Amino acid sequence: MAIKKLSTSSFSSGTKISKLWDQITNSTITVEYLVIGGGGSGGAQIGGGGGAGGYRTAAGLVISKNISHVITVGAGATHPGDRGGGYKGSSSSFGNYITSEGGGAGGGFGGNGGNGGSGGGGAGQDGGTTSGGIATLGQGNNGGAGQSNRLSAGGGGAGGVGQNGGNGSGGSSSTSTITGTSIARAGGGGGRGSSRGGDATLNTGSGGGGGGNISGNSGDDGVGYGRGGFGGSGVVIIQSPQLAVQTTGSPTYINPSANVHVYVFNSDGSIKF
Protein backbone atom coordinates (compact mmCIF):
# COMPACT_ATOMS: atom_id res chain seq x y z
CA MET A 1 0.00 0.00 0.00
CA ALA A 2 1.33 3.43 -0.94
CA ILE A 3 2.30 5.80 1.87
CA LYS A 4 0.51 9.12 1.62
CA LYS A 5 2.40 12.38 1.96
CA LEU A 6 2.38 13.63 5.54
CA SER A 7 1.05 17.10 6.23
CA THR A 8 3.37 19.43 8.19
CA SER A 9 0.52 21.57 9.49
CA SER A 10 0.16 19.55 12.68
CA PHE A 11 3.87 19.83 13.40
CA SER A 12 3.79 23.55 12.67
CA SER A 13 0.87 24.20 15.01
CA GLY A 14 2.51 22.13 17.74
CA THR A 15 5.69 24.16 17.42
CA LYS A 16 3.73 27.41 17.65
CA ILE A 17 1.99 26.23 20.82
CA SER A 18 5.33 25.21 22.30
CA LYS A 19 6.87 28.59 21.49
CA LEU A 20 3.86 30.40 22.92
CA TRP A 21 4.14 28.38 26.13
CA ASP A 22 7.84 29.21 26.36
CA GLN A 23 7.02 32.90 25.97
CA ILE A 24 4.47 32.73 28.77
CA THR A 25 6.68 30.81 31.19
CA ASN A 26 9.71 32.99 30.43
CA SER A 27 7.78 36.21 31.02
CA THR A 28 6.48 35.37 34.51
CA ILE A 29 7.82 34.01 37.78
CA THR A 30 6.05 32.61 40.86
CA VAL A 31 7.10 34.09 44.20
CA GLU A 32 6.22 34.04 47.89
CA TYR A 33 5.77 37.31 49.74
CA LEU A 34 5.36 38.87 53.17
CA VAL A 35 4.17 42.48 53.23
CA ILE A 36 3.67 44.26 56.58
CA GLY A 37 2.50 47.85 57.00
CA GLY A 38 3.90 50.30 59.53
CA GLY A 39 2.54 50.03 63.07
CA GLY A 40 0.28 52.61 64.68
CA SER A 41 1.51 54.63 67.64
CA GLY A 42 0.08 54.41 71.13
CA GLY A 43 -2.10 57.11 72.62
CA ALA A 44 -0.97 59.36 75.46
CA GLN A 45 -2.77 60.00 78.77
CA ILE A 46 -3.82 56.50 79.76
CA GLY A 47 -3.71 55.65 76.09
CA GLY A 48 -4.55 52.54 74.14
CA GLY A 49 -1.86 50.60 72.31
CA GLY A 50 -1.24 51.10 68.60
CA GLY A 51 -2.40 48.44 66.17
CA ALA A 52 0.05 46.34 64.17
CA GLY A 53 0.50 47.04 60.49
CA GLY A 54 -1.49 44.92 58.07
CA TYR A 55 0.04 41.45 57.59
CA ARG A 56 -0.30 39.70 54.24
CA THR A 57 1.64 36.62 53.16
CA ALA A 58 1.19 33.82 50.65
CA ALA A 59 3.03 31.62 48.16
CA GLY A 60 2.11 31.18 44.51
CA LEU A 61 1.91 34.81 43.39
CA VAL A 62 2.62 35.03 39.65
CA ILE A 63 4.34 38.28 38.66
CA SER A 64 5.82 39.67 35.46
CA LYS A 65 9.52 39.37 34.67
CA ASN A 66 11.69 41.94 32.93
CA ILE A 67 10.03 44.92 34.65
CA SER A 68 10.90 46.64 37.93
CA HIS A 69 8.37 46.16 40.72
CA VAL A 70 8.31 49.09 43.14
CA ILE A 71 8.63 48.25 46.84
CA THR A 72 7.20 50.66 49.42
CA VAL A 73 7.93 50.09 53.11
CA GLY A 74 5.51 51.89 55.40
CA ALA A 75 6.84 54.05 58.21
CA GLY A 76 5.77 53.43 61.77
CA ALA A 77 3.64 56.22 63.20
CA THR A 78 5.27 58.86 65.35
CA HIS A 79 4.11 59.37 68.93
CA PRO A 80 1.54 62.09 69.76
CA GLY A 81 3.55 63.80 72.47
CA ASP A 82 2.11 63.86 75.97
CA ARG A 83 -1.46 64.64 74.92
CA GLY A 84 -3.98 63.02 72.61
CA GLY A 85 -4.36 59.91 70.52
CA GLY A 86 -1.71 58.18 68.48
CA TYR A 87 -1.40 58.11 64.71
CA LYS A 88 -1.99 55.53 62.00
CA GLY A 89 1.03 53.82 60.43
CA SER A 90 1.79 54.05 56.71
CA SER A 91 0.97 51.27 54.25
CA SER A 92 3.51 48.95 52.58
CA SER A 93 3.21 47.54 49.07
CA PHE A 94 4.76 45.17 46.55
CA GLY A 95 4.27 46.56 43.06
CA ASN A 96 0.63 46.65 42.01
CA TYR A 97 0.03 43.24 43.54
CA ILE A 98 -0.13 43.53 47.33
CA THR A 99 -0.82 46.38 49.77
CA SER A 100 -0.88 46.14 53.56
CA GLU A 101 -2.47 48.97 55.53
CA GLY A 102 -0.79 50.80 58.37
CA GLY A 103 -1.79 49.91 61.92
CA GLY A 104 -4.54 51.86 63.67
CA ALA A 105 -3.85 54.59 66.20
CA GLY A 106 -4.18 54.01 69.92
CA GLY A 107 -6.80 56.23 71.54
CA GLY A 108 -5.81 59.10 73.84
CA PHE A 109 -7.64 59.64 77.15
CA GLY A 110 -11.33 58.87 76.60
CA GLY A 111 -10.79 58.24 72.87
CA ASN A 112 -11.52 55.27 70.63
CA GLY A 113 -8.86 53.26 68.86
CA GLY A 114 -8.34 53.93 65.16
CA ASN A 115 -9.00 51.55 62.27
CA GLY A 116 -6.11 50.06 60.31
CA GLY A 117 -4.35 46.86 59.31
CA SER A 118 -4.95 45.88 62.93
CA GLY A 119 -7.06 48.22 65.05
CA GLY A 120 -5.72 50.47 67.78
CA GLY A 121 -6.76 49.99 71.39
CA GLY A 122 -9.30 52.21 73.11
CA ALA A 123 -8.07 54.52 75.86
CA GLY A 124 -9.10 54.43 79.48
CA GLN A 125 -11.30 57.08 81.04
CA ASP A 126 -13.05 57.89 84.29
CA GLY A 127 -16.49 56.61 83.30
CA GLY A 128 -17.87 54.55 80.44
CA THR A 129 -16.02 52.63 77.76
CA THR A 130 -14.20 53.33 74.50
CA SER A 131 -14.12 51.10 71.44
CA GLY A 132 -11.18 49.44 69.79
CA GLY A 133 -10.33 50.10 66.15
CA ILE A 134 -11.50 47.75 63.39
CA ALA A 135 -8.96 45.71 61.43
CA THR A 136 -8.78 45.62 57.64
CA LEU A 137 -10.32 42.36 56.43
CA GLY A 138 -7.70 39.66 56.02
CA GLN A 139 -4.84 41.75 57.39
CA GLY A 140 -5.08 41.70 61.17
CA ASN A 141 -7.29 41.87 64.25
CA ASN A 142 -9.34 44.43 66.14
CA GLY A 143 -8.09 46.52 69.03
CA GLY A 144 -9.45 46.03 72.53
CA ALA A 145 -12.03 48.24 74.25
CA GLY A 146 -11.02 50.73 76.93
CA GLN A 147 -12.90 50.74 80.22
CA SER A 148 -13.76 53.02 83.09
CA ASN A 149 -11.40 53.50 86.02
CA ARG A 150 -8.74 54.53 83.51
CA LEU A 151 -8.17 51.04 82.10
CA SER A 152 -6.87 51.23 78.53
CA ALA A 153 -6.74 48.43 75.96
CA GLY A 154 -4.14 46.82 73.74
CA GLY A 155 -3.93 47.25 69.99
CA GLY A 156 -4.70 44.35 67.69
CA GLY A 157 -1.91 42.18 66.32
CA ALA A 158 -1.50 39.95 63.28
CA GLY A 159 -2.12 36.89 65.44
CA GLY A 160 -4.86 38.03 67.82
CA VAL A 161 -7.12 40.78 69.10
CA GLY A 162 -5.99 43.37 71.63
CA GLN A 163 -7.07 42.73 75.20
CA ASN A 164 -9.78 44.91 76.69
CA GLY A 165 -9.16 47.48 79.41
CA GLY A 166 -7.15 46.47 82.39
CA ASN A 167 -4.13 48.04 80.76
CA GLY A 168 -4.53 45.19 78.30
CA SER A 169 -1.83 43.40 76.41
CA GLY A 170 -1.45 43.95 72.69
CA GLY A 171 -2.66 41.29 70.30
CA SER A 172 -0.18 38.54 69.52
CA SER A 173 2.23 38.65 66.60
CA SER A 174 2.38 36.19 63.71
CA THR A 175 5.36 33.99 62.87
CA SER A 176 6.83 33.47 59.39
CA THR A 177 9.66 31.29 58.07
CA ILE A 178 9.93 33.01 54.67
CA THR A 179 13.59 33.90 55.33
CA GLY A 180 14.46 30.38 56.45
CA THR A 181 14.27 31.40 60.11
CA SER A 182 11.14 31.58 62.24
CA ILE A 183 10.52 35.24 63.14
CA ALA A 184 7.52 36.81 64.91
CA ARG A 185 6.34 40.18 63.65
CA ALA A 186 3.37 42.57 63.82
CA GLY A 187 2.34 42.42 67.47
CA GLY A 188 -0.10 44.96 68.90
CA GLY A 189 1.01 47.63 71.36
CA GLY A 190 0.02 47.21 75.00
CA GLY A 191 -2.29 49.57 76.89
CA ARG A 192 -0.84 52.28 79.14
CA GLY A 193 2.34 51.62 81.00
CA SER A 194 3.42 53.28 84.21
CA SER A 195 4.82 56.26 82.31
CA ARG A 196 5.62 56.52 78.59
CA GLY A 197 4.57 53.84 76.16
CA GLY A 198 7.18 51.51 74.73
CA ASP A 199 8.42 52.06 71.18
CA ALA A 200 8.00 49.16 68.76
CA THR A 201 10.97 47.46 67.11
CA LEU A 202 11.90 48.69 63.63
CA ASN A 203 10.78 46.66 60.59
CA THR A 204 8.35 44.49 62.53
CA GLY A 205 5.16 46.46 61.87
CA SER A 206 4.31 46.27 65.58
CA GLY A 207 2.19 48.85 67.37
CA GLY A 208 3.53 51.28 69.95
CA GLY A 209 2.51 51.06 73.59
CA GLY A 210 0.01 53.40 75.24
CA GLY A 211 1.27 56.18 77.47
CA GLY A 212 0.61 56.29 81.20
CA ASN A 213 -0.97 59.01 83.25
CA ILE A 214 2.33 60.23 84.69
CA SER A 215 5.33 61.24 82.61
CA GLY A 216 8.55 59.32 83.04
CA ASN A 217 10.36 62.12 84.88
CA SER A 218 7.56 63.66 86.91
CA GLY A 219 7.41 61.19 89.77
CA ASP A 220 4.02 60.57 91.33
CA ASP A 221 2.81 64.11 91.72
CA GLY A 222 0.56 64.06 88.67
CA VAL A 223 2.55 66.58 86.65
CA GLY A 224 2.45 65.76 82.96
CA TYR A 225 1.43 62.64 81.07
CA GLY A 226 3.37 59.82 79.47
CA ARG A 227 3.54 59.84 75.69
CA GLY A 228 2.53 56.91 73.54
CA GLY A 229 5.14 54.73 71.88
CA PHE A 230 6.24 54.90 68.26
CA GLY A 231 4.92 52.29 65.85
CA GLY A 232 7.42 49.96 64.21
CA SER A 233 8.19 50.43 60.52
CA GLY A 234 7.00 47.78 58.10
CA VAL A 235 8.87 45.30 55.92
CA VAL A 236 8.51 43.66 52.49
CA ILE A 237 10.07 40.24 51.89
CA ILE A 238 10.14 38.42 48.55
CA GLN A 239 11.22 34.79 48.11
CA SER A 240 11.80 33.44 44.60
CA PRO A 241 13.30 30.38 42.86
CA GLN A 242 15.57 32.62 40.76
CA LEU A 243 18.03 35.40 41.47
CA ALA A 244 16.80 38.91 40.81
CA VAL A 245 18.55 40.59 37.89
CA GLN A 246 18.30 44.02 39.53
CA THR A 247 17.36 45.54 42.89
CA THR A 248 17.41 49.04 44.35
CA GLY A 249 17.09 50.15 47.95
CA SER A 250 19.80 47.76 49.22
CA PRO A 251 17.62 44.83 50.33
CA THR A 252 19.20 42.15 52.49
CA TYR A 253 19.82 39.00 50.44
CA ILE A 254 19.41 35.57 52.06
CA ASN A 255 20.04 32.19 50.41
CA PRO A 256 18.69 29.64 52.92
CA SER A 257 18.85 26.68 50.51
CA ALA A 258 19.40 25.79 46.86
CA ASN A 259 17.09 27.62 44.44
CA VAL A 260 15.63 29.74 47.26
CA HIS A 261 16.46 33.43 47.06
CA VAL A 262 15.10 35.89 49.62
CA TYR A 263 15.14 39.69 49.46
CA VAL A 264 14.30 41.64 52.63
CA PHE A 265 13.36 45.28 52.07
CA ASN A 266 13.57 47.44 55.20
CA SER A 267 13.19 50.60 53.13
CA ASP A 268 11.78 51.60 49.74
CA GLY A 269 13.29 50.08 46.61
CA SER A 270 12.50 47.90 43.62
CA ILE A 271 13.13 44.41 42.27
CA LYS A 272 13.29 42.93 38.77
CA PHE A 273 13.51 39.25 37.75
Model-predicted regions and their roles:
Residues 2-14, 19, 30-273:
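Low-complexity, glycine/proline-biased repetitive segments and flexible coils/loops
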Residues 20-24:
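Large eukaryotic, non-enzymatic subunits of multiprotein complexes that serve as scaffolds/tethers
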